[in-house]
Design a protein with these regions (language model features):
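Structured, solvent-exposed acidic/aromatic patches
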Residues: 1-19, 28-141
Length: 141
């Protein structure tokens, strides 16, 4: 909830969580979603694949088609990248002194070992490659 966290922590925590959700669902799709999409995308786009959980509920998440699942994955990754781009210390868009008051307990230490902005961009590229849509990879950022 945005009203509980300050702006910096909100952007980093929500960005990480969205990226981790996409990462987990992508692994599930790779394991249980009919294999590599790049050679058979038209055949597999309409088949039901995995449930994609976007909220916590006692009811099962709906099972989506391949195209819908990929769209949900990329939406999560795009939102995560947008949240992390200007706030993640690893991007160095802000001076190190900006993070000092927030980093009393070391939360921002070792950003290279966490789901950071560059890990999100790498996962986006991995999804596009697996999907067989290499021309969609955003290499500018």
């Amino acid at each position: 909830k945005k009203e509980i966290l300050d702006d910096l922590n909100y952007h980093i925590i929500k960005g990480e969580l969205l990226a981790i959700r996409a990462y987990i669902h992508f692994d599930l799709l790779r394991l249980y979603g009919y294999g590599n999409w790049s050679q058979r995308d038209t055949e597999l786009d309409e088949k039901r694949t995995i449930p994609y959980a976007t909220e916590v509920s006692k009811d099962p998440a709906p099972q989506y088609s391949g195209a819908e699942t990929i769209k949900l994955l990329l939406n999560d990754l795009n939102e995560a990248a947008a949240l992390l781009k200007d706030y993640d210390p690893i991007t160095k868009t802000k001076a190190a002194s900006f993070y000092q008051e927030y980093n009393e307990e070391g939360f921002f230490n070792e950003r290279t070992l966490r789901m950071n902005y560059y890990a999100v961009k790498a996962l986006q590229a991995r999804v596009y490659l697996w999907r067989g849509k290499n021309e969609d990879i955003d290499s500018r950022n």
